[in-house]
Amino acid sequence: MASVTLKNVCKAYGDVLISKNVDLEINEGEFVVFVGPSGCGKSTLLRCIAGLEDITSGDLYIGEERMNDVEPSKRGVGMVFQSYALYPHLNLYDNMSFGLKLAKADKKEIDKRVEQAAEILQLGHLLERLPKALSGGQRQRVAIGRTLVSQPKVFLLDEPLSNLDAALRVQMRAQITKLQRQLGCTMIYVTHDQVEAMTMADKIVVLDGGFVSQVGKPLELYHYPENRFVAGFIGSPKMNFMSVQIVDVESERVQVKLSNGVTFWVPVDGTTVNKGDRMSLGVRPEHLVSSAQGDAVIDGEVMIVEKLGNETQVYLNLESADADVIYRQPDTLDVDSGDRLEIGIPAHRCHLFHSDGRACKRLFNEKGVER
């Protein structure tokens, strides 16, 4: 195990800057997930840590050692790619032991490591099979096992579940999390799927356009996003945003007016807000309530209803919203397309964002989050 530290790291291809002034501290034994949309620089950053890409400027440390000029094979990292990259003519044992054989490791040591990895990954009964005889999930476990036998100080995983179907992704998600807890290893995992990030990570790094947008525990990012990008990216379905006008301001609450003229107080830090400002009000679909329970009521035409059995998602057309407002309720809701529906907004679950995307600090204390 080892810590990983990035100090003002930048990566450029010619004049195009991909990773921009990245500062990160990843502790020993921590499971960290890099998440963000396509093209945000998350895989590039992982490849810089692995040594597959040169760092343009800044410093990378693994443990106490500066790694900028150290070749990949000597960094003590192991990498699992989106592609399984298994040798089709070799059985599982030979695939998993290939790197150790290349390094001329002792035969007994090779056998010991492969057997241990196979036991952990539940592959012991498959060691004589060729990759073509395996399922997608089993092939992915072999790829992880090949990295595991090299006993790296840091595991790097670049979108390892992207090629799997939805049900298998859920299963492998749990297995990788269990493996990391069992080994206590330092693991850095790249994904564009915020659900993977929320369910697996000790700490999430949200990337946007090469910059680190926010770093924190999953529930910190969910309940207390520092900007509108993180608020909209973390959570599924995404957060609803509505344009509001600021009517009054106090140090620990702000009065907002919706497009329908309804006003209510939102418990946020008001020190950066001015009367008359136009701002974005954010509220998550699962935090909306019935009209009787809300501090403010909005109504709109029902456009789409998704009845999933365990929950219902309703898409409402609302003039003041940036897109259809999504209302999410457990169980089945008796509503159909074309109906008018009133829903309530609970003030204490609301977020408030400046025009430049900065969030006002929320003052309501959510369960499960240390502040």
Swiss-Prot record:
Key words, A-Z? ATP-binding, Cell inner membrane, Cell membrane, Membrane, Nucleotide-binding, Sugar transport, Translocase, Transport
What Pfam families does the database record attribute to this sequence? ABC_tran, TOBE_2
Q: Subcellular location, in the record's words?
A: Cell inner membrane
Q: Which SUPFAM superfamilies match?
A: MOP-like, P-loop containing nucleoside triphosphate hydrolases
A molecular function (GO) term: ATP hydrolysis activity
Q: The ABC transporter domain covers which part of the protein?
A: 4-234
The UniProt record gives the binding positions of ATP as 36-43
One GO cellular component term: ATP-binding cassette (ABC) transporter complex, substrate-binding subunit-containing
What is the membrane topology noted in the UniProt record heading this document?
Peripheral membrane protein
Presence of the UniProt keyword Nucleotide-binding in the record: yes
Look up keyword Disulfide bond and say if it applies.
no
List the CDD domains: ABC_MalK_N (cd03301)
Instruction: Tell me where on the tree of life, at the top rank, the source sits.
Output: Bacteria
Catalytic activity field: D-maltose(out) + ATP + H2O = D-maltose(in) + ADP + phosphate + H(+)
Enzyme Commission number(s) from the entry: 7.5.2.1
The main enzyme category here is translocase
Protein family membership: Belongs to the ABC transporter superfamily. Maltooligosaccharide importer (TC 3.A.1.1.1) family.
- What interactions and quaternary structure are annotated? The complex is composed of two ATP-binding proteins (MalK), two transmembrane proteins (MalG and MalK) and a solute-binding protein (MalE).
Record's NCBIfam families?
Answer: PRK11000.1, PRK11650.1
> Its biological function?
Part of the ABC transporter complex MalEFGK involved in maltose/maltodextrin import. Responsible for energy coupling to the transport system.
Name the record gives this protein: Maltose/maltodextrin import ATP-binding protein MalK
The source organism is Vibrio vulnificus (strain YJ016)
Q: What is the lineage of its organism?
A: Bacteria, Pseudomonadati, Pseudomonadota, Gammaproteobacteria, Vibrionales
Name the gene that codes for it.
malK
